[in-house]
């Protein structure tokens, strides 16, 4: 889908660049596949702020997207493509031959009327799902499982994909968008193709108010606060903080490595950080 620009009738319109969604379904989502969604405002179950600068925003209904695609060898027809406010990608409503409906992540080049199917050995075409070990090397995939049967976790946002670059015994080698290469078990499943809406990265929000509609509040820097509020705060006039960047709680930030999951390090063949050196 193309990008939309607008006549500069206001400063916000002048800057605004949106994805043209005219080809998407304009009605309401399927009620049986949606749930109510309460705004958390960045608070956890105790009412304390756990994520700063969140709150407000437009009311949203959550669409239950099927990331597992567990219905094997039952063809489904794509009924329509829809907008989903909860993610950057578009979603597709599919209807199985037995009448059941489901939402899936829409890949690029998936059109209304197409047939998709999940199974052990299926055609290599967008939207079909099968184990990574049964796909040819070089296949572009999305919505990839990291644990067998858990449901897709990798390459789910707009325009993303992973590529199968090799095999190693029971595992396949995946190259991710970040540049990381990692081992994923061959029985983990993935959907063929790249995720829809690749133009999302070229959009421009245009004005602060549109960000507020998305539920994001103004972000305040530590150096403009008082010493009671932030380690970088205080000082006469403008200061640079006077120390290496830290969070409001004094922990190093901006490049400090925080990964502690050593048990899965053996599955990472090439780190995403190696590419930047």
UniProtKB/Swiss-Prot annotation:
Transmembrane residues, as ranges?
Answer: none
Q: Which InterPro entries match?
A: NA-bd_OB-fold, Rib_uL2_dom2, Ribosomal_uL2, Ribosomal_uL2_bac/org-type, Ribosomal_uL2_C, Ribosomal_uL2_CS, Ribosomal_uL2_dom3, Ribosomal_uL2_RNA-bd_dom
One Pfam family linked to the record: Ribosomal_L2_C
GO CC, sorted alphabetically, is: large ribosomal subunit
Q: Which SUPFAM superfamilies match?
A: Nucleic acid-binding proteins, Translation proteins SH3-like domain
Keywords (alphabetical) are: Ribonucleoprotein, Ribosomal protein, RNA-binding, rRNA-binding
* GO biological process per UniProt: cytoplasmic translation
Output the Gene Ontology terms for molecular function: rRNA binding; structural constituent of ribosome; transferase activity
* SS bond partners: none
Disordered: region residues? 223-277
* Function of the protein: One of the primary rRNA binding proteins. Required for association of the 30S and 50S subunits to form the 70S ribosome, for tRNA binding and peptide bond formation. It has been suggested to have peptidyltransferase activity; this is somewhat controversial. Makes several contacts with the 16S rRNA in the 70S ribosome.
* HAMAP family in alphabetical order: Ribosomal_uL2_B (MF_01320_B)
Describe the protein's quaternary organization and the partners it interacts with: Part of the 50S ribosomal subunit. Forms a bridge to the 30S subunit in the 70S ribosome.
Q: Output the NCBIfam families linked to this UniProt entry.
A: rplB_bact
- Similarity comment: family membership: Belongs to the universal ribosomal protein uL2 family.
Q: What name does the UniProt record give this protein?
A: Large ribosomal subunit protein uL2
